[in-house]
Amino acid sequence: MGMGGQSGEGCSSGDCVKPEAQYSWEEIQKHNLKTDKWLVIERKVYNISQWVKRHPGGMRIIGHYAGEDATDAFHAFHPDKTFVRKFLKPLYIGELAENEPSQDRDKNAQQVEDFRALRKTAEDMRLFKSNPAFFIFYLFHILLIEFLAWCTLHYLGTGWIPAIITVLLLTISQAQAGWLQHDFGHLSVFEKSKWNHLVHKFVIGHLKGASANWWNHRHFQHHAKPNIFSKDPDVNMVNVFVLGGTQPVEFGKKGIKYLPYNHQHLYFFLIGPPLLIPVYFTVQIIKTMIARKDWVDLAWSVSYYVRFFFTFVPFFGVLGSLALLNAVRFFESHWFVWVTQMNHLPMAIEHEKYQDWLNTQLAATCNIEPSFFNDWFSGHLNFQIEHHLFPTMPRHNYWKIAPLVRSLCSKYNVTYEEKCLYHGFRDVLRSLKKSGQLWLDAYLHK
């Protein structure tokens, strides 16, 4: 129950400071309902029940922290915290009671403070400052590859070999554009968020034909609560796959069998990588833009298709250009799925456990060994741990903070997992097979 503070003495009615309400964690944790949401940032309590609908990052991501301490998430997602705090002022309703710890649910206070000290060290090392030349070169190399695809057809014709080379080049440019839009989407390039948002729309919209707002809505939830059912959209497999160690058993005991999940590591090759981008994402993106009347993103997306067909219809005609588009999407989808899943799918996938930021991210992520190829191939997402801990950090600085992250994890016996690229791919299938077997055992013995 909230406890009123003491007002100042001898002040006029207009100058009196209102007593600050104080709240216990027990009371705050009750406010995690659909229409009643409180959260805590730096011991200050905010009522976000109505404001969630206006939250620029989306109502779901902030709602996932209702009833919790959101301090580390607040710092992770907002580069310009001074600006963002202006929006918090009207939502402020009080403070944590003096006898309440800063961390909720018996979290390790010293570990949390050490992680925050690590973030301060990264700021002092200027690791959140981007190198413009890196991203200019990266954009240039994407545009150059697209130009080489056009040159291949212009100078070599439209035979099978030039067509295959064109598909290969466009697949590379699309995959790399996917990693580049990720940088701008995370506000990790420009100091001003508005420039990140603008270039993000250009890269994901004009260069890829997708939607910035759709991506933000999905991806930020994934970062806020990775591998947590009902909160991370990336583990919502619409009953096609069962993941982790908990969901398969739950499905099995309930007799749920939409598909033969014990064979999911096999049918993954048929309906996972081949269909995610060409079918599922494409339909979802178009549907979302129209349903939300997101005409700006729709215009950017249309500009991609206009440019694509304007470029390739003279070589292949309309149907041939459609075939080219889908071939590129098909191969890009394989690239995207394997890279994104190797960092998360073999890790813990559970219901909410209310862990601190460090443990939440480390339980759900692993790294792939750095190398020139691995860095380029994955868009530096082989440093997935560092990226999840510091999502606004420019990717070219991950390697600088990685040793300090390792040291912190070692201090508190938090598993820091890193593997080679082959083992990353292998563990995706092993994870699916293991989860499928758990489902079968529970299903047969329900």
From Swiss-Prot:
Membrane topology (Cytoplasmic): 1-132, 176-265, 329-446
Motif extent (Histidine box-3): 384-388
Pathway: Lipid metabolism; polyunsaturated fatty acid biosynthesis
GO MF annotation list: oxidoreductase activity, acting on paired donors, with oxidation of a pair of donors resulting in the reduction of molecular oxygen to two molecules of water
EC id: 1.14.19.-
Location of the protein in the cell: Endoplasmic reticulum membrane
Coiled coil spans: none
Keyword Nucleus carried by entry: no
InterPro entries named in the record: Cyt_B5-like_heme/steroid-bd, Cyt_B5-like_heme/steroid_sf, FA_desaturase_dom, Fatty_acid_desaturase
GO BP field: lipid metabolic process; unsaturated fatty acid biosynthetic process
Bilayer topology annotation: Multi-pass membrane protein
TM region(s), chain numbering: 133-153, 155-175, 266-286, 308-328
Function noted in UniProt: Component of a lipid metabolic pathway that catalyzes biosynthesis of highly unsaturated fatty acids (HUFA) from precursor essential polyunsaturated fatty acids (PUFA) linoleic acid (LA) (18:2n-6) and alpha-linolenic acid (ALA) (18:3n-3). Catalyzes the first and rate limiting step in this pathway which is the desaturation of LA (18:2n-6) and ALA (18:3n-3) into gamma-linoleic acid (GLA) (18:3n-6) and stearidonic acid (18:4n-3) respectively and other desaturation steps. Highly unsaturated fatty acids (HUFA) play pivotal roles in many biological functions.
Protein's name in the database: Fatty acid desaturase 2
Record lineage: Eukaryota, Metazoa, Chordata, Craniata, Vertebrata
Recorded name of the encoding gene: fads2
